[in-house]
Structure formats: C-alpha cells, structure tokens
Amino acid sequence: MADSGSMSEPGRSHHPLAARAASTQDAALRERRAAIAELGDALRELVELASATEVPADVLRQVAAQARQAATRLGRQTRTRTELPGADDLAGGFRMYNLVTGSGSALAPPLHIEVAGQAVVGTCTLGLAYEGPPAFAHGGTSAMLLDQLLGYAASAAGQPGMTVKLETRYLAPVPLQTPLRLTAEVSEVTGRHVTARGTLTTAADPDTVLVEASGEFVSLRPEQAARLFGGIRPDATDPQVAHD
C-alpha cells in the first residue's frame, strides 16, 4: 500500500511499483522531461484558445499555417506505436503523453494525482476544449478522468491492471473552467480482479457528487502481457507494469 500523502510527480500516470526502482534521474532525462512539459503547456494553451477564439477568418488561417510549420519541425524525428517515448518509465509510473495525466500531452487537462491514506485524489480544471453541452464537460471526459483515477488507485494498492469494466453514473453536469476534485479507492480484491470506486465533484463543494463510477481491473498473466506488449520493449512484458 502506498504511503499516506505521497505526491505524484508531473507526467506520472500510475503509482510507481514498490518492487521496482524508479529510473535514474540523470540531467539529460530531467531536461527532456522539462522540455516535453513546456511544449505540452504551450500546446494545451493553443488548443484551449483555438476552442475559445472569435478572431477573424484570416487570422485563423495565418495561425493554421504557423501550426503546420511547427508540426513539420516536430515530425523530423518521430516514434511508431510500438516504440515507447524516450522520457517514459513504465516501472516508475511515468507516461509523459498519457491522455489524462501526461504533462506532454496536448489533450490532457492534465489530472494531478496524490495518494491520501487508502484513497487517491485527483485535481484538474477542464477548459472549453472539453465542452459537451454548452458550459459543461462532455460526459466521456468525466468517464475518462475517473477511469484513470480508479486505475491509479488499483496500482497504488499494489494491484495494477487493465480496465475490464467501467460503470459511470451522472448525477449532475460537470462545469467547465471550474477546479474539480476526484477521489478513488479500492473496494474489493478477488484474485487478479480489483474493484475501485470513485467520485467527481467541484473543489469548492466536495460533498456534492456530480459523477460517480465503479471500475473493475484485472492483472495480466505473463503470457497475456507478452502477447500485448512483448513487441514494445522487454520490461513491458512484466505483468506488473501493464496498465495505463
């Protein structure tokens, strides 16, 4: 079980494994992660402003051309789907481009997670880019956030796994541009199967639940992990690191 008050570092998508040491934090790796996070911040700002802007059409086209120029520079050296980013560390919990927590992801809020006793707590603010109904978040975004946090709770409890079932109940719309608070905790462990439950509220009113969810996660057998991840890199065949 994770220690109470353990803080998640930026870019960490799941709890570091107790049996595995975190990757060596050499200067070059720290610098690359910092640069990835800096680019991620800039891209998230661009995505948000692109969703909010009302500038004239000619300005939109100018910005589109500039964005394509930047994309060309980034595209000079890329990875494939079977190659992990050089800044990632599965055993240490670092997935820099994770869709929910990744500090390098243009699409992540990102969700910041910490361990608090037996529970895990996540905080984030959703901008206009996550809009579903006007002024409120898309329901799929709420499910995505809770799926990530429930999985983090499972890994923090020493039971990492992949999602096999997610049940979400929407009690009220989730407001945009409003600080949010999510909590999750493991409620049951049966063999390789783990059940976790969580809620989503605003930070200002944590007693009023907007969305609640229950997720079931299963730890992969070694042969399953090898089949799914064996072609990516050797330590990805370890079933203890096979999760989001």
What feature does the model see in each segment?
Residues 5, 9, 23-30, 149-181:
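Hydrophobic beta-strand-centered segment that forms part of the acyl-chain substrate-binding groove
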Residues 119, 137-160:
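Active-site helix/loop of acyl-thioester processing domains in fatty-acid/polyketide metabolism
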